[in-house]
Amino acid sequence: MGLLESVKSINWEHESSPVYQDFRVLPLFAVFFPSIRFLLDRFVFEKLAKYLIYGKHRQDMGDDTTERKKKIRKFKESAWKCVYYLSAEILALSVTYNEPWFMNTKYFWVGPGDQTWPDQQTKLKLKLLYMFVAGFYTYSIFALVFWETRRSDFGVSMGHHIATLILIVLSYVCSFSRVGSVVLALHDASDVFLEVGKMSKYSGAERIASFSFILFVLSWIILRLIYYPFWILWSTSYEVVLELDKDKHPIEGPIYYYMFNTLLYCLLVLHIYWWVLMYRMLVKQIQDRGKLSEDVRSDSEGEDEHED
C-alpha cells in the first residue's frame, strides 16, 4: 500500500478527547518544515527570485549587488511564507467547511449529540490541522534565529511566535480548537495577499504589489476587523456562557473563559494597531499614485543579515 492509499485509509472523522500526549508527533512536523523549505529554497525559490528580479538581463546575474542579494533573500522568505499560509488556509478550510460550526458559531460549543464545551471530542482531521500549525511555529522560533533575515522587530516576532505556540497548545487541550481553526483560517487568508504583495514589490512588479496590498487591506477589514470581533468574539464572550455547565465545571470553566477571551481580545487590539499602520501606508500609496511603499508592518529592517 502506497503513502497516498495509507492516508486515504485513515478515518479522519474519528473523534477522541484532546490531550497533551497528542503533541508527541509535534517534533515530526517541526522537522518537516525546514526540510521542505530547504528543498524549495534551493530548487524553486532561488531560481524564481533571480528570474523575476533580474528579468531579461540575465547577463547581470554574475554581478550581484548587495541590494539585489537582499531582495533575493527576502523574496525567498516571502515565497516560503506564502506557500505555508496558502497550504494552511487550504487545510483549515478543508477541515472546517462542512462542519456545522463553520456557518453557525453556536456549534463551537455544542454537538455532536449531547456534547457541550469543554467536554467535546476532537476529530482527527482537526488534530492534524493543529499539529501542522504548531509544528510550523515551533520551527519558526528556530528559523527566526538561524535562518530569517534579522529585522528590527526581531524581539516582537519572537514573542509573537512563542505566544502563538502557547495559545495553540492551550486552546487545543482546553477544547477551543473549533474556534481556533476558524481564527487560523481568518488570519492565513490575509497573510497570503501580504506575501504575494511583498514578492511583487521585491521583483519590481508595482501594479501587482499594489493590487495585492488592496486585497490584503480589504481582507483584513472584512475578516479581522468585522467578522472576528462581531462573530468570533461575540460567540466566545456570550454564546459559550449559555452552554457551559457551571455546576460541572465551577472552576476550570471560568478560568478557560477569561484566559482565552483575554488573549483573543489582545489579538483584536493588535489587529487595530496594525490597521492604523496599514491605513497610513494606504494613504501614502494614494499620494504616490499607486506606488507601494515599504511594508511598515513587518519589513522594516535593521539589516543585521543572516545568510541562507
UniProtKB/Swiss-Prot annotation:
Annotated positions of the Phosphoserine modification: S298, S300
Main subcellular location of this protein, as a coarse class: endoplasmic reticulum
Entry's EC annotation: 2.3.1.-
Disruption phenotype: No visible impact on ceramide and glucosylceramide species with C(14) to C(28) fatty acids. The double mutant loh1 loh3 is embryonically lethal. Rare viable loh1 loh3 seedlings have a complete absence of very-long-chain fatty acid (VLCFA) in sphingolipids and exhibit strong dwarf phenotype and altered lateral root outgrowth associated with disrupted early endosomes and an impaired polar auxin transport due to abnormal localization of auxin transporters in the plasma membrane; these phenotypes are in part restored by external auxin (NAA).
InterPro entries in alphabetical order: Lag1/Lac1-like, TLC-dom
Organism: Arabidopsis thaliana
Protein name as it appears in the record: Ceramide synthase 1 LOH3
Lineage per the UniProt record: Eukaryota, Viridiplantae, Streptophyta, Embryophyta, Tracheophyta
Membrane-traversing stretches: 25-45, 82-102, 128-148, 154-174, 213-233, 258-278
TLC domain location: 73-287
PANTHER family (UniProt xref): CERAMIDE SYNTHASE 1 LOH3 (PTHR12560:SF49), LONGEVITY ASSURANCE FACTOR 1 LAG1 (PTHR12560)
Catalysed transformations (reactions): (4R)-hydroxysphinganine + a fatty acyl-CoA = an N-acyl-(4R)-4-hydroxysphinganine + CoA + H(+); a sphingoid base + tetracosanoyl-CoA = an N-tetracosanoyl-sphingoid base + CoA + H(+); (4R)-hydroxysphinganine + hexadecanoyl-CoA = N-hexadecanoyl-(4R)-hydroxysphinganine + CoA + H(+); (4R)-hydroxysphinganine + octadecanoyl-CoA = N-octadecanoyl-(4R)-hydroxysphinganine + CoA + H(+)
Tissue specificity annotation: Expressed ubiquitously at low levels. Not observed in pollen.
GO molecular function, one term: sphingosine N-acyltransferase activity
Keywords: Endoplasmic reticulum, Lipid biosynthesis, Lipid metabolism, Membrane, Phosphoprotein, Transferase, Transmembrane, Transmembrane helix
Bilayer disposition of the protein: Multi-pass membrane protein
Record pathway: Sphingolipid metabolism
Pfam family, one: TRAM_LAG1_CLN8
Signal peptide: none
